[in-house]
Amino acid sequence: MTVDAVRVELGARAYEVRIGPGLIARAGAEIAPLLRRPKVAILTDETVAGLHLDPFRQALVEAGIASSALALPAGEATKGWPQFARAVEWLLEEKVERRDVVVALGGGVIGDLAGFAAAVLRRGVRFVQVPTTLLAQVDSSVGGKTGINTAQGKNLVGAFHQPSLVLADIGVLETLPPRDFRAGYGEVVKYGLLGDADFYEWLEGAGPRLAADAEARQRAVRRSVEMKAEIVARDETEEGDRALLNLGHTFCHALEKATGYSDRLLHGEGVAIGCALAFELSQRLGLCAQEAPSRLRAHLRAMGMKVDLRDIPGDLPSAEALLALMAQDKKVVDGKLRFILARGIGQAFVADDVPGDVVRALLEDALAER
């Protein structure tokens, strides 16, 4: 299999997302052209470090590149002020300069945190994303959104800071626990739902074999990245089209906050549930036929994924409380909730005028089924 390259066209800040097998084994050769001096600082997590840090550093050694590494605790709870401050202080202790490169080796949590640390360190240093989860490869590593969570909600503090390079080694996805792989698939299916009905139809057939079929996996990652790159090139800072990428996320972020950013609900699981709710909301508003949410739920079930609120273990707050959590979402405009709705599969659009009582009724019905 060959390596695919998808270019994110952002003028002087354009970069490539390279997708294929064996990219960690030759990471040194891939990163070397970016370096002013042969040294990088790696931010990772303890789980990823145990699997991939040594091979990654060996690849750097083979290219004559020295490295230092900090492994943070794994999990969404790391994506907050304490570990962010720890990472920034460590980078300063390592004397990382403005012309140096920080490497984010890990999933979405590490990519977001490391990217934000790079954005604020000395008012901005370059960084390279080496995403090791399906979710990070198809979504969070591309497009320059970085940040952390706060007590008030998810991703409320951050910056747009584009990477200089993304290396998506599809081989490392074979080390993912099945639950994490399925969670990442929530972001893959999102792309078909928001703007490519043919891709969604292909996923309905190919989805169940992605974990075991490297060629299908690479195709899924490549098409997802192509779609994201096209949208980011049109709307880097989410003034318009880029909001489409938040399909399912208004519900998702409220549910993540309600479950304490814990293992009760992984981000990609929340995205899948959020997409199902967004399509159900669209149907209730008369925007799409009942076939669309039914078809989506059937596919997610076939993939063994969480689909409804009843699939989330433990207690959940009331519909009113979930609405209050949504009101803190960063997509709120003039105090009004912004949803990504759909006229059908592959036909998403941004809606700023969704009646709150319809959303409340949807949540009440979903909670009643638990």
Curated annotation (Swiss-Prot):
Membrane-spanning ranges: none
Chief localisation class: cytoplasm
Role: Catalyzes the conversion of 3-deoxy-D-arabino-heptulosonate 7-phosphate (DAHP) to dehydroquinate (DHQ).
This protein's record includes keyword Ribosomal protein: no
Note on how the cofactor is bound: Binds 1 divalent metal cation per subunit. Can use either Co(2+) or Zn(2+).
Protein name: 3-dehydroquinate synthase
Xref: PANTHER family: 3-DEHYDROQUINATE SYNTHASE (PTHR43622), 3-DEHYDROQUINATE SYNTHASE, CHLOROPLASTIC (PTHR43622:SF7)
InterPro entries, sorted: Dehydroquinate_synthase (IPR050071), DHQ_synth_AroB (IPR016037), DHQ_synth_fam (IPR030963), DHQS/DOIS_N (IPR030960), DHQS_C (IPR056179)
Annotated positions binding NAD(+): G108, V109, I110, G111, D112, T132, T133, K145, K154
EC code(s) of this entry: 4.2.3.4
UniProt record similarity statement: Belongs to the sugar phosphate cyclases superfamily. Dehydroquinate synthase family.
Catalytic function, reaction form: 7-phospho-2-dehydro-3-deoxy-D-arabino-heptonate = 3-dehydroquinate + phosphate
GO MF annotation: an example: nucleotide binding
HAMAP family: DHQ_synthase
Compartments where located: Cytoplasm
Binding site for Zn(2+): E187, H249, H267
Pathway per the UniProt entry: Metabolic intermediate biosynthesis; chorismate biosynthesis; chorismate from D-erythrose 4-phosphate and phosphoenolpyruvate: step 2/7
One record GO biological process: chorismate biosynthetic process
GO annotations of cellular component type: cytoplasm
Top-level taxon of origin: Bacteria
Cofactor(s), by name: Co(2+); Zn(2+); NAD(+)
Pfam families according to UniProt: DHQ_synthase, DHQS_C
EC primary class: lyase
Keyword annotations of the record: Amino-acid biosynthesis, Aromatic amino acid biosynthesis, Cobalt, Cytoplasm, Lyase, Metal-binding, NAD, Nucleotide-binding, Zinc
